[in-house]
């Protein structure tokens, strides 16, 4: 493991770990599994340590970090909170960082601020950096800039602070400032990790698509990590460039490995290119064998081929890695009790995961289980509003929505749908629309959405929910809009059914609607409750809603939602958004 050969190290641990009792050996094996991405194996070993009474801070921290990495924030937070009380600045800093990553910004800010004020301690400047990030997440941007601007203890920390300020500039729409800072950082010998893709994002979000494409063409393979390749692939797809998967395929040819395999195979399967996916599976098996990564891709390909019985016959190397596909297969075969069991296992593995909650809801509906009502009652959880709009224009509401439409037009720079999103044959604005704008109509729109949303969130519904209800259990301490984007549609555009995995509550606001859409037919309607996968007995929608200019719709992020295509003249422009934990982009 010290030499970096994690595959060999894991293989050695696999041969002996079942009978190992030494706490240090178990901890080292857990570390190795964690670094190799075998998170469930790492957690199993840490559970063995806990059962032995070995709950020392490093083991607790590793367990919390793994929970955080798989979005099991509900399990990670109590561990980070316990670690924050240990009188050890390094452990406390790690706990503060974990609290931040789990979205408890207030607790992270309090702890980071206390650590930053410890003069002469080596951790104080790192804590000040985290404090600045917490302030930015709390939308206290001036304080964040002031805090980050004072950090100069070492060149590395100063670069890190400059990088975070640049990300804050990008997040708040100060594109020129972000670009200038990032270019300066990239001229240094060792720029901060992520600076290059952040510059690419800055170019894309500011509409400089030609410059972004040139940046991709001029990049060298040596500096291309997977994060960079993902950003490039998305942009190449949305700008209709030839062979948008070329960079991922080239990386696989030159440096094959599990991570690039999963990324490329996932893209091929999403594009329904099963021939290339099968070829990739064969190549991977020759080098790495039919391991858990191969099995995940193989089972996903079987799902695309509707080979559901064959899926259930597969030997599962990593149960949780493929459980989602198994769950889908049970639905398709009408084995709803088994689908419910699989969904429950997934929810236990990642409490709060909106997709897994949606699987659970779907199973309850297929079984006609009365427990579904607590999760699907549209009369309670769905809200529609048509609020009075701000008087920005003399023409009233009509001119307000037209001004919003015109402001959004300046943010549209793509020519095709994002390949990993739900929209088909439409385009989507890049970035976070309502934080990256200085346009008065969009600022007014955000204020309007916040007013409608928080009036609903502060109502009696959420106070009366049972404690285990996901809308109560996973409600953030402080709810804020953390993502927003606009989608421009035309005749034929529609959305695949999906959930918003990073939200708590989601919504849409209709800015432009074709005159042909009405209640007499479902064309162009928003559809709630239809799953995106096959069920032996088709489920009816929970609700279908006709778009109308100025209408705002809110629904739980775990609710499947899609749109029907429409025909005829006229476009449809919507602003979609998620409420949940604070945005931690900075």
Where are these regions (language model features)?
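Structural register within alpha-helical repeat arrays
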Residues: 29, 63, 95, 131, ...
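Non-heme Fe(II)/2-oxoglutarate
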Residues: 373-472, 494
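Catalytic core of non-heme Fe(II) oxygenases with the double-stranded beta-helix
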Residues: 436-450, 454-554, 559-586
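TPR-repeat structural position
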Residues: 6, 39, 73, 105, ...
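Single-residue signature of alpha-solenoid repeat helices
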Residues: 9, 42, 76, 108, ...
């Amino acid at each position: 493991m010290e030499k970096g050969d994690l595959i060999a190290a894991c293989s050695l641990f696999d041969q002996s770990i079942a009978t190992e009792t030494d706490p240090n050996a178990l901890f080292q094996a857990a570390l190795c599994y964690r670094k190799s991405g075998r998170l469930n194996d790492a957690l199993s070993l840490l559970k063995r340590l806990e059962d032995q009474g070995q709950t020392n801070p490093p083991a607790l921290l590793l367990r919390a970090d793994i929970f955080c990495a798989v979005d099991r924030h509900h399990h990670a937070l109590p561990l980070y909170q316990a670690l924050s009380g240990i009188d050890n600045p390094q452990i406390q800093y790690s706990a503060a960082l974990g609290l931040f990553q789990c979205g408890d910004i207030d607790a992270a800010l309090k702890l980071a601020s206390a650590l930053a004020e410890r003069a002469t301690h080596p951790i104080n400047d790192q804590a000040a950096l985290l404090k600045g990030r917490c302030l930015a997440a709390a939308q206290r941007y001036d304080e964040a800039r002031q805090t980050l601007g004072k950090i100069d203890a070492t060149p590395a920390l100063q670069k890190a602070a400059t990088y975070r300020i640049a990300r804050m500039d990008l997040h708040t729409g100060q594109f020129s400032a972000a670009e200038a800072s990032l270019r300066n950082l990239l001229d240094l010998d060792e720029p901060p990790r992520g600076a290059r893709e952040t510059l690419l994002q800055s170019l894309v979000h500011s509409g400089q698509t030609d410059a972004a494409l040139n940046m991709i063409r001029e990049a060298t393979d040596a500096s291309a990590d997977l994060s960079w390749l993902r950003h490039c692939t998305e942009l190449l797809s949305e700008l209709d460039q030839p062979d948008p998967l070329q960079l991922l395929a080239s990386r696989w040819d030159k440096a094959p490995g599990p991570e690039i395999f999963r990324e490329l195979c996932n893209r091929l399967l999403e594009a329904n290119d099963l021939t290339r996916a099968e070829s990739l599976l064969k190549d991977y098996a020759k080098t790495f064998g039919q391991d858990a990564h191969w099995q995940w891709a193989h089972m996903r390909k079987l799902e695309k081929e509707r080979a559901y019985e064959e899926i259930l016959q597969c030997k599962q190397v990593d149960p949780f890695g493929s459980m989602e596909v198994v769950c889908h297969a049970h639905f398709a075969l009408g084995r709803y009790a088994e689908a419910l069991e699989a969904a429950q296992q997934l929810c236990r593995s990642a409490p709060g995961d909106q997709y897994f909650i949606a699987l659970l809801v779907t199973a309850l509906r297929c079984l006609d289980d009365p427990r579904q009502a607590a999760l699907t009652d549209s009369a309670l959880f769905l809200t529609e509003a048509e609020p009075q709009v701000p008087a920005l224009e003399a023409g009233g509401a009509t001119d307000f929505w037209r001004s919003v439409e015109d402001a959004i037009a300046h943010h549209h720079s793509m020519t095709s749908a994002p390949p990993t999103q739900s929209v088909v044959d439409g385009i989507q604005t890049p970035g976070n629309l309502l934080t990256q704008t200085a346009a008065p109509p969009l600022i007014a729109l955000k204020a309007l959405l916040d007013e409608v949303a928080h009036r609903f969130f502060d109502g009696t519904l959420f106070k009366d929910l049972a404690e285990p209800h996901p809308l109560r259990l996973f409600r953030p301490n402080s709810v804020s809009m953390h993502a927003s984007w606009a989608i421009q549609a035309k005749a034929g555009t529609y959305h695949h059914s999906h959930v918003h995995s990073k939200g708590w509550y989601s919504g849409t606001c209709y800015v432009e609607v074709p005159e042909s859409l009405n209640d007499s037919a479902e064309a162009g309607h928003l559809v709630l409750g239809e799953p995106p996968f096959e069920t032996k007995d088709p489920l009816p929608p929970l609700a279908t809603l006709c778009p109308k200019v100025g209408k705002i719709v809110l629904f739980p992020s775990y609710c499947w939602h899609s749109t029907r295509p429409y025909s005829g003249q006229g476009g449809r422009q919507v602003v979609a958004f998620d409420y949940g934990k604070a945005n931690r982009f900075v």
